[in-house]
UniProtKB/Swiss-Prot annotation:
This is DNA gyrase inhibitor YacG. Disulfide bonds: none annotated. It comes from Allorhizobium ampelinum (strain ATCC BAA-846 / DSM 112012 / S4). Inhibits all the catalytic activities of DNA gyrase by preventing its interaction with DNA. Acts by binding directly to the C-terminal domain of GyrB, which probably disrupts DNA binding by the gyrase. Its cofactor is Zn(2+). Residues 1-22 are annotated as: Disordered. Gene3D superfamilies: Erythroid Transcription Factor GATA-1, subunit A (3.30.50.10). The gene is yacG. One of its GO terms (molecular function) is zinc ion binding. Binds 1 zinc ion. Belongs to the DNA gyrase inhibitor YacG family.
Length: 69
């Protein structure tokens, strides 16, 4: 074995770190798009509690009513 340094390729990340949607710190690959498991769990908790909601347009027609009667 020689004492020469090993030549290794520089690995570029697949995507640039974006700010964590919870706290603003740079995201990490393991928890993308979050920076940590804590932020990821906190976001999941908000979804499960119903803090986030996807808006739905109210439609007054009944989808089960096919107009036969």
């Amino acid at each position: 074995m020689s004492d020469e340094p090993e030549h290794t390729a520089k690995v570029e990340p697949l995507r640039k770190p974006l700010p964590c949607p919870e706290c603003g710190h740079p995201s990490h690959r393991e928890h993308y798009p979050f920076c940590s498991d804590r932020c990821r769990t906190q976001d999941l908790s908000r979804w499960l509690k119903g803090s986030y909601a996807i808006p739905v347009a109210e439609d007054e027609s009944n989808p089960d009513d096919d107009g036969r009667f």
